[in-house]
Amino acid sequence: MFVRMLVFRVLLLIALVGKSVIGLSLMSFIAPPDPDWTPDDYYYSYEQSSPDEDPSVTQTTPENPDWYYEDDDPCQSNPCEHGGDCIIRGDTFSCSCPAPFSGSRCQTAQNKCKDNPCVHGDCLITQKHPYYRCACKYPYTGPDCSKVLPACRPNPCQNGGVCSRHRRRSRFTCACPDQYKGKFCEIGPDDCYVGDGYSYRGKVSKTVNQNPCLYWNSHLLLQETYNMFMEDAETHGIAEHNFCRNPDGDHKPWCFVKVNSEKVKWEYCDVTVCPVPDTPNPVESLLEPVMELPGFESCGKTEVAEHAVKRIYGGFKSTAGKHPWQVSLQTSLPLTTSMPQGHFCGGALIHPCWVLTAAHCTDINTKHLKVVLGDQDLKKTESHEQTFRVEKILKYSQYNERDEIPHNDIALLKLKPVGGHCALESRYVKTVCLPSDPFPSGTECHISGWGVTETGEGSRQLLDAKVKLIANPLCNSRQLYDHTIDDSMICAGNLQKPGSDTCQGDSGGPLTCEKDGTYYVYGIVSWGQECGKKPGVYTQVTKFLNWIKTTMHREAGL
């Protein structure tokens, strides 16, 4: 059933361990990932540049194939990160990077802190000369944190705390009034988190193990997925501070802590949960009128903002809620000896009771199939997940395979309601819109998933990447698919070097394109060859709009 090793997508090149990044190639099968996936510690390495080259301007090379898509303006999407300026150079581009960033896309930061210029403080990366500053540990001060002040003059304790000096001039203790805590009595009774703590904006900066948190722009975090320079950092409350946050939708706030001069790890924070408000009297609740559950207000909207400067950032752990229409198809029985039970394909939620996926993912009995919405970590049962059984599988009638290539590779899954309803809208679960018009070639779109196909393992964390739509005549060229692409298919790939970023996603998962702040499911991950070297092939959703709408109307009375 699922044995298409050479054709269907092997869709993972980068996987995440905890909150650190490791490389993983499904083609090697050298070392399977640890089934427990405990967070690994990360060693920071420094990038050296040759003295006779300008690291701030890097041109693309022949290894970056410019034949991947037709685009008159390679700078249209601004592929340069961290505020870099894109410069057109013939058919390609280069990035002029603001200090201290360098690299072909300004993705690397020069480490001004490697010689430890801060004697009694933390060295932080900044974007203004000299591109670092010292955050001194009180009572030390000065540009290099070498000067010490009287510990209790002036009183550093907040909220009425009383400062007591120790024998050593730099040591002191704050005696805090009731309901206040922290080194400076800065944490008040209202400093708590609700739910999973995604919205927490308090000032706790210690972990459950009483380790101090690193600043989010610490030089030790430059290569971490989550730092002050990440995409939409401000949206997640991340800035130049060391307060606990939860940008990835974990079950409580966390932060990075220092292990040694080059090594960090992450730990959960010592933050209290906000008290639950009093519930109404049960008798009174019974007297309230029964209200129908509201439907989804709109489609294609995410509550996670993007920076104005777009990034091509494939292979990173996706921010929780960034792809709220992403679906995980899971089986209760092993499909093959190499494909155990659990996640095996992706999908897209297009209506509270309907999931769009690839037809080649549906050769399975509905009694062994379940759909999980809002999933971020496959190894955890997260509080915001919603799980449903499948009432019916409806494949497109003309789906077929010729020479191991799927044609008209599309199917609908009708969800079985739970408690009288299907999916409930939340920050983590939303529907994606169906497109009404085609997007032009060169449009930058999104793929997401856990990097799993029918033939291999993948990431436990949801990954995402950006790809560009490729004109079918170009995709049918001899260098690519040599006239095997029909009008039910669409190709998409990146200007990345071969072997990176073009295989993030799952069979059946969505290819979404954005217009005016709304996301549309424009393709369904279908198949591909030479992962990372050739673009992916997707079912073109616009070719099947009439079938989708007719089927949903007939089956559900929409």
From Swiss-Prot:
One of its GO terms (molecular function) is calcium ion binding. The record marks 478-479 as: Cleavage. Residues 191-274 form the Kringle domain. Residues 312-553 form the Peptidase S1 domain. GO terms for cellular component: extracellular region. SUPFAM superfamilies: EGF/Laminin, Kringle-like, Trypsin-like serine proteases. Its main location: secreted. It is found in: Secreted. Keywords: Cleavage on pair of basic residues, Disulfide bond, EGF-like domain, Hydrolase, Kringle, Protease, Repeat, Secreted, Serine protease, Signal. Gene3D superfamilies: Laminin (2.10.25.10), Plasminogen Kringle 4 (2.40.20.10), Trypsin-like serine proteases (2.40.10.10). Transmembrane segments: none annotated. Its EC number is 3.4.21.-. GO terms for biological process: proteolysis. Residues 71-107, 109-146, 148-186 form the EGF-like domain. Pfam families: EGF, Kringle, Trypsin. Liver and kidney. Disulfide bonds join 75-86, 80-95, 97-106, 113-123, 118-134, 136-145, 152-163, 157-174, 176-185, 192-274, 213-255, 244-269, 299-433, 345-361, 353-422, 445-513, 475-491, 503-531. The active site is at 360 (charge relay system), 409 (charge relay system), 507 (charge relay system). PANTHER family: HYALURONAN-BINDING PROTEIN 2, TRYPSIN-RELATED. Cleaves the alpha-chain at multiple sites and the beta-chain between 'Lys-53' and 'Lys-54' but not the gamma-chain of fibrinogen and therefore does not initiate the formation of the fibrin clot and does not cause the fibrinolysis directly. It does not cleave (activate) prothrombin and plasminogen but converts the inactive single chain urinary plasminogen activator (pro-urokinase) to the active two chain form. Activates coagulation factor VII. May function as a tumor suppressor negatively regulating cell proliferation and cell migration. Heterodimer; disulfide-linked. Heterodimer of a 50 kDa heavy and a 27 kDa light chain linked by a disulfide bond. This is Factor VII-activating protease. It comes from Mus musculus (Mouse). The lineage of its organism: Eukaryota, Metazoa, Chordata, Craniata, Vertebrata.
